[in-house]
Amino acid sequence: APKDDTWYTGAKLGWSQYHDT
């Protein structure tokens, strides 16, 4: 699922920035 991977990558980056830890 390429679409899933795309949203997953964005979510990972966003999560990392959102949770600056």
UniProtKB/Swiss-Prot annotation:
From the Swiss-Prot or TrEMBL record, state where the protein is found. Answer: Cell outer membrane
Going by the entry's taxonomy, the superkingdom of the source organism is recorded as Bacteria
Q: How does it sit in the membrane?
A: Multi-pass membrane protein
What are the protein's GO molecular function terms? porin activity
Membrane-spanning residues where? 6-16
Quote any Pfam family the record assigns. OmpA_membrane
Question: What does the UniProt keyword field contain?
Answer: Cell outer membrane, Ion transport, Membrane, Porin, Transmembrane, Transmembrane beta strand, Transport
Q: In terms of one coarse class, where is the protein primarily found?
A: membrane
Question: Single Gene Ontology BP term?
Answer: monoatomic ion transport
What's any one GO cellular component for it? pore complex
* UniProt cross-references to Gene3D superfamilies, sorted A to Z: 2.40.160.20
How the protein assembles, per its UniProt entry? Monomer and homodimer.
Family to which this protein belongs = Belongs to the outer membrane OOP (TC 1.B.6) superfamily. OmpA family.
Task: State the protein's purpose.
Answer: With TolR probably plays a role in maintaining the position of the peptidoglycan cell wall in the periplasm. Acts as a porin with low permeability that allows slow penetration of small solutes; an internal gate slows down solute passage.
Query: Domain annotation text?
Result: The extracellular loops are most variable in sequence, and in some bacteria confer sensitivity to phage and/or colicins.
State what protein this is by name: Outer membrane protein A
Q: What is the protein's species of origin?
A: Actinobacillus lignieresii
Q: Which gene encodes it?
A: ompA
